[in-house]
């Protein structure tokens, strides 16, 4: 999707400092691989959600969405829509501060 393409550089930047996991929602495997071939693969692991049910269960409403999940499983950031490097830095800082971790 165009918003996924737009945020790809920010996700790559994030993957240099934090583990990034991805969920492929409703894409054909060959389309997902073509995306990764074109934009690179920043993901440590990629889950597959072919019918979108798992994404709906965790509250995904639009693509892309970025979640930061604390070690205890709490969602401490849920950003809907593409996220860009300038937004990402502030969002991560705020999320880490909510855990008592100073940046």
Regions found by a protein language model. Give the residues of each.
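The canonical Cys-X-X-Cys-His
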Residues: 1-5, 66
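Nucleotide phosphate-binding site architecture
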Residues: 2, 12, 76
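Short gly/ser/thr-rich secondary-structure transition/capping motifs
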Residues: 2, 46-49
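Structural microenvironment flanking redox-active thiols in thiol-disulfide oxidoreductases
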Residues: 5-39, 50-56
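Short, conserved active-site loop motifs that form the nucleotide-linked donor/cofactor pocket
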Residues: 18, 44-45
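Thiol/disulfide oxidoreductase modules built on the thioredoxin-like
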Residues: 37-42, 49-96
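Non-globular targeting/processing and membrane-anchoring segments
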Residues: 100-103
């Amino acid at each position: 999707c165009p918003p996924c393409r737009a945020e790809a550089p920010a996700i790559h930047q994030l993957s240099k400092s934090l583990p990034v996991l991805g969920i492929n929602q409703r894409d054909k495997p060959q389309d997902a691989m073509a995306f990764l071939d074109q934009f690179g693969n920043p993901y440590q692991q990629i889950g597959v959600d072919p019918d979108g049910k798992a994404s709906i269960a965790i509250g995904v409403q639009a693509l892309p969405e970025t979640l930061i999940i604390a070690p205890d499983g709490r969602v401490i950031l849920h950003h809907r829509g593409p996220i860009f490097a300038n937004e990402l830095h502030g969002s991560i800082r705020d999320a880490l501060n909510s855990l008592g971790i100073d940046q």
